[in-house]
A protein has these predicted regions:
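Conserved AdoMet/S-adenosylmethionine-binding subsite of the radical SAM
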Residues: 1-86, 90
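Conserved Radical SAM active-site core
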Residues: 1-11, 192-212
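A generic secondary-structure signal for well-formed alpha-helical elements
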Residues: 43, 47, 189-196
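Conserved residues at the C-terminal ends of beta-strands
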Residues: 53, 103, 191
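Flexible loop/turn segments at secondary-structure boundaries
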Residues: 59, 108-110, 184, 195-196
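A C-terminal junction/extension of Radical SAM enzymes
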Residues: 79-165
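Long, low-complexity, charged/polar intrinsically disordered accessory regions
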Residues: 137-138, 142-143, 177, 193-195, ...
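Local cysteine-cluster metal-coordination motifs and their immediate loop/turn environment
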Residues: 165-193
Length: 212
């Protein structure tokens, strides 16, 4: 699906995310890097960017994770560094080198060429829609120049005040809805009940403009 979507709309529009990074007795730094390495070999030609982040130990998420494996936990500072160094090293061997970034993280890995991401990235929006005057007014002068062809990096852009402190996203409107994804990822905070989510999914009308 990732490759097909990239071929249809362009690799700059499809961002590869690998998060959150979780460690445990059966999930070591080396095993995580092995998985990322295999995926990077397969996906690097179909995207321009990899964004990753580390597990935030929200109580509800940790309860769900510990129900599967009590050893699951966030990486230590040393493990975060090892993961970042490993990802940067893998990137140098992939068929196509990617722009690397973290999402809402305090750790600074810029010496490894890893930036702080903005998932709603104004520089990418401006790159995709360079003639959109409304976007230009809102996002012109972005400092988040993660993509070629972005505007000047010397001025600040408007940050979304509704997001957490470390989030770099520009203002946007969420068009998604909670409780609508049937993948049921254990860490996901958007699903509170599998039965409720499956009920919504079953009732979804693909011809409707609404999710539910």
């Amino acid at each position: 699906i990732f490759q097909r979507l990239s071929e249809q709309i362009g690799p700059h529009r499809v961002i590869w995310r690998f998060d959150p990074l979780i460690v445990g007795k059966k999930l070591s730094v080396s095993s995580i890097l092995e998985k990322i390495g295999r995926l990077g070999t397969a996906l690097s030609a179909y995207t321009e960017r990899l964004i990753f982040s580390f597990l935030d130990p929200y109580k509800k998420a940790m309860n769900k994770l510990h129900a599967i494996d009590p050893s699951f936990r966030p990486p230590t500072n040393e493990e975060e560094t090892a993961l970042a160094e490993g990802i940067a090293r893998l990137n140098s061997f992939w068929p196509h080198s990617l722009s690397l970034a973290t999402c809402a993280e305090t750790a600074d890995f810029e010496k490894l060429g890893i930036q702080h991401a903005a998932c709603i990235d104004p520089s990418l929006l401006l790159r995709i829609n360079p003639e959109d005057s409304d976007l230009a007014k809102l996002y012109a002068g972005t400092r988040q120049c993660h993509f070629p062809g972005a505007f000047s990096a010397t001025r600040l852009y408007i940050k979304d005040s509704g997001q957490r402190k470390l989030c770099n996203c520009a203002p946007s409107k969420d068009i998604g809805a909670y409780g609508t994804c049937p993948h049921m990822c254990t860490y996901c905070y958007a699903n509170t009940s599998s039965a409720r989510t499956l009920r919504f999914f079953t009732a979804h009308d693909s011809d409707s403009s609404l999710l539910i």
